[in-house]
Amino acid sequence: MAEESKAAEYFDPLDPLSFNELRYVVNLVRKSYPEKQISFDVVTLSEPHKEEYVHWRYSSAHEGIPDRRAYVIVLEKEVPGVFEGIVNLTTGKIEKWEHSVDTCPIITADLLAITDEIVRNDANVIEQCKICGVPESGLSNVYCDPWTIGYDERYGSGRRLQQALMYYKPGDSGHLRSIPLDFCPIIDVDQKKVIAIDIPKVRRPIPQDVNSDNNLKKLEQEMEAMKMLKPLRITQPEGVNFRIKGRYIEWQNFCFHIGFNYREGIVLSDVVFNEDGHLRPLFYRISLTEMAVPFGAKGHSHHRKHAYDLGEYGVGYRTNPLSFTCGCEGVIHYMDADFVNYRGEITTIKNAISIHEEDDGVLFKYSDLRDRNANISARSIKLVVSQVFTAANYEYLVYWIFRMDGVIECEIRLTGILNTNAINEDEDLKGHGTQVYPKISAENHEHLFCLRINPMLDGLRNSVATVDALRDKNGTLVSKYIIPETVTEAISNYDSSTGRTWDICNLNKLHPYSGKPVSYKLISRDTSPVLSQPGTTNSDCSGFAENNIYVTPYMDDQIFPTGDYAPQASDDTPKGLSKWISDDPNAQIKNTDIVVWHTFGMIHFPAPEDFPIMPAESIHLFLQPRNFFKHNPALDTSSSVNSTSEATSPNTHHENLRDTSQKRESHSTPHDYEPHVSDKNDKSVEDKLHFVQKDESRPKEPVVDAAQKHEGRSETLAQPGQQNANQSEEKQGGQNGSNGGHHHHHHHHYITGHVYGGYHKHSGSGGHLVDMMKNISDVTHDFAMGNFRYHKYD
């Protein structure tokens, strides 16, 4: 089974498998099993063990690079179950090959297309369409939405099954889910045939007396008031403030790796922050690892509507190729995603990941009418790393947002088309749904996401504290801080009455001023535990959704809270996160390497305003530094003078606005930095992660004297074909004054820099906050020592 060794093509061990690496793995597997008729379900990176990666990443010489491995799931014709393997690309050998019988793999787009074809050509399905009122001439406009069947006790988990939600599109103009049909075929995808059709006791024929076309373009044209919006332009004439090398991105003081796989989509790894020249580890790995969408109606087929979109379909597989219609403005950097289809062919999703910057409003502001020299303000920008994926009728837009004050936000926007049902006129929905159109209803449902966080705050040994706001006996406000020691004690839920948050902290590192452990606070108020009853089909695999917070000891193979295989999993035994906790309920999670599992989401009670297409609705969570930095980490930002804005009448028409259809170009940003940490001291990995030493390998700049006038130049990256950014600034400097206000929100900050008065000093235009802080009477700067100190004046 050995194959000639393959020299892997990658920049970092966490990079996704390249096009050539995927092709190499497919060929190696086929040559190793030439007599087998196999199809591919998954070929993806098998991430290196954390211990191996951290040792290599933070060692002084970067020695001991982990082997490059692929994780493979294949199916063999007429053989139940799946074959799971590990392929070592470094050695050219298959290290693991196991057959799992009672297991159903992830459902790929190829399989969904096959199911649709099977259903539309089945004679019994065609008969049911006619019974529902579909005319003979309209049979070609019948479509199905293939879903995994969940778990159906009639069939167990030994067969690969799907259920087909049926729809009729009258004419050529409506969308594919215009009119729902009232029956549900069951398909055996291995036998490629319909094995049953579930039919309700009370039939619900399609409406014949209303225009149910539901064509979005047509409805748009029929709106009485068509508003032509004047275009809003986002431009970055001097380029972007981020740098990319391989899949590492450096922006402001953040540096992190962007991964991508078939199941989770975007994976953020090795997230560090540069504070005054020290590279401080924040998080080893952050990703969305599951999403449950349970529906609330009872009766015919509705009890099976409980999707696990990551575990059953894979949001990487379902990712849209992004374009300039996705809502991103400005200069955009894209990353593609390569996958293997069931035939072993390599397919590419172009522009699967978008990276761009957005204006973020006020960063901070202070006004003092008694001393206007003390007035300061700064405007913020944010970095957005995003993907968009389609899960059946829903569209999910996932945004990972990095802010200049050290905050990391996850925002998810939900839009798309409602999952609808056929109903009879005046039918009582018993509170389980809403009629959104004549004879069409939509069920109540939930969207529950599981965020997996593996922290690395100044080291590998972290803890989690529950923080509540309470009144003490004197009626004053105090915080209650509880640090659980076991996985059972750590289970908790959001409490709005106490404003509950969770501190992910390092008890071994205390803040020099507050004396509290350095931490990042998890703020999440879009929370709701799963409302399905325990033991029902809708609660299968949903152990992760029963509470908002779980904490477990770190294990390399514990990634997915619904287990490795979610499709058609029964509720007989605990799986995934539920199993890990039940196996060792007293496992210690204090001051050790931990994983935080957070369930958040929303409850959706549909309304007519959601039909025929839903306005986007957002949910948010934040990871915010608390007692982590010595001071506001965004103080290295130039003060803001917005020279590009203008006052105008709301009725003013600007003739110079260009056509909104003008094509914008994305730019690949230049990159010339090495993301590795250079540490000359021969310390243990744990010591290095407590507080990574100041990077001695980067070029140093002299400490600027307090009396010396700062004459730094903006180091904004210039795009090809643009004039040098420094020259541009010099030409405009006289117009903008000493504050250098032009394009202040495009001011570029490299992670490299020098210590200036205790703040991390970046080159930039005038008006730096360090200079402005000299006007505040109770603060001085000890430039000789390069430290920031507080002094009380006599």
Curated annotation (Swiss-Prot):
Compositionally skewed regions (Polar residues) per UniProt: 716-727
PTM description: Topaquinone (TPQ) is generated by copper-dependent autoxidation of a specific tyrosyl residue.
Cofactor info, note text: Binds 1 copper ion per subunit. Can also use zinc ion as cofactor. Contains 1 topaquinone per subunit.
Cofactor(s) needed by this chain: Cu cation; Zn(2+); L-topaquinone; Mn(2+)
Cellular component aspect of the GO annotation: cytosol
Residues that bind Mn(2+): 593-594
One Pfam family named in its UniProt record: Cu_amine_oxidN3
Ion transport as UniProt keyword: no
Subcellular location: Cytoplasm
Residues that bind substrate: 307-318, 391-396
GO biological process: amine metabolic process; cellular detoxification
PROSITE patterns for the chain: COPPER_AMINE_OXID_1, COPPER_AMINE_OXID_2
Chain positions recorded as Cu cation binding sites: 445, 447, 604
Keyword line: Copper, Cytoplasm, Manganese, Metal-binding, Oxidoreductase, TPQ
Residues found modified as 2',4',5'-topaquinone: 394
Keyword Metal-binding in record: yes
Catalytic EC class: oxidoreductase
Enzyme Commission (EC) number: 1.4.3.21
Biased composition (Low complexity): 637-649
Sequence segments annotated as region (Disordered): 563-584, 634-748
Role summary: Copper amine oxidase-like protein that does not show any copper amine oxidase activity. May be the appropriate amine substrate for cao2 has not been identified yet.
Designated name of the protein: Copper amine oxidase-like protein cao2
